[in-house]
A protein has these predicted regions:
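Cross-family detector of peptidyl-prolyl cis-trans isomerase
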Residues: 21-227
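Sec-dependent bacterial lipoprotein signal peptides
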Residues: 1-21
């Protein structure tokens, strides 16, 4: 009986050891990538290093603050309409919902209707890239130096902000809040794909909040066809 017990314990112990090793490797890679992204930001976008968001480990560049008289989109669960263009660290466009960006990438097609994404943004993430969901739901923080240099241009009164209608922002994200590789589909692709475990730069602009996205998009498509 003791022999059988020892016999059964050996593979279980081995499985636990392998699981522990895999977890340690994943955690080590995340730490390595975060350090590598920080080094890249320090070299290429040192002005954004203080704009680090601890929940998600990404950096932000606020291009336009949006209409500050309106409620932030994270106030309650809602469907959000937003333009989206994603690039790798070399600046190559991976996917885009923007016609001008598609022309820049050389992938524009007159048969593609370039409309914003419609995604549900709730208290739990069900359909958004993790980093974009975190940016939509959380209060973001700007570094003191960045805030002082840009507050007048952006019309800000606080280094803390939330996304709302008209906000245009760039996110520099580690793969941990991106997913396992990225590529465009359905005419929205760029000239490249993003391999897994690679950082991703997303430029997004909040275009609207939508109660019925199917009805809205159907109307947009009908208008496009009429034109």
């Amino acid at each position: 009986m003791k022999f059988i017990t020892r016999f059964l314990c050996v593979p279980v112990a081995g499985l636990l050891a392998l699981t522990s090793c895999a977890k340690d490797e994943d955690e080590s890679y995340v730490q390595f990538e975060n350090q590598a992204l920080e080094a890249w930001m320090t070299q290429h976008r040192s002005d954004l290093v203080q704009n680090y968001q601890s929940d998600g480990g990404y950096y932000i560049d606020l291009i336009e603050a949006g209409d500050q008289s309106l409620d932030p989109i994270g106030k309650e669960p809602i469907w959000v309409s937003f333009d989206f263009t994603g690039r790798d660290l070399a600046g190559n466009i991976i996917l885009t919902r923007n016609a001008d960006s598609a022309r820049l990438a050389g992938t524009f097609s007159k048969y593609t209707h370039y409309v914003p994404f419609y995604r549900y943004c709730g208290t739990e993430n069900t359909g958004l890239m993790e980093g974009t969901w975190l940016a939509m739901r959380n209060t973001l923080k700007l570094g003191e130096k960045y805030y002082n240099a840009n507050k007048d241009r952006l019309g800000l009164r606080s280094p803390e902000l939330q996304l709302r209608y008209g906000t245009k922002i760039q996110l520099y994200m580690p793969s941990s809040v991106v997913g396992n590789g990225v590529e465009g589909t359905g005419g929205y692709e760029g000239q490249y794909t993003l391999s897994s475990k690679r950082p991703f730069i997303v430029t997004m602009e909040i275009r609207d909040t939508v109660n019925n996205p199917l009805e809205r998009e159907g109307g947009d498509v009908d208008g496009f066809c009429d034109d």
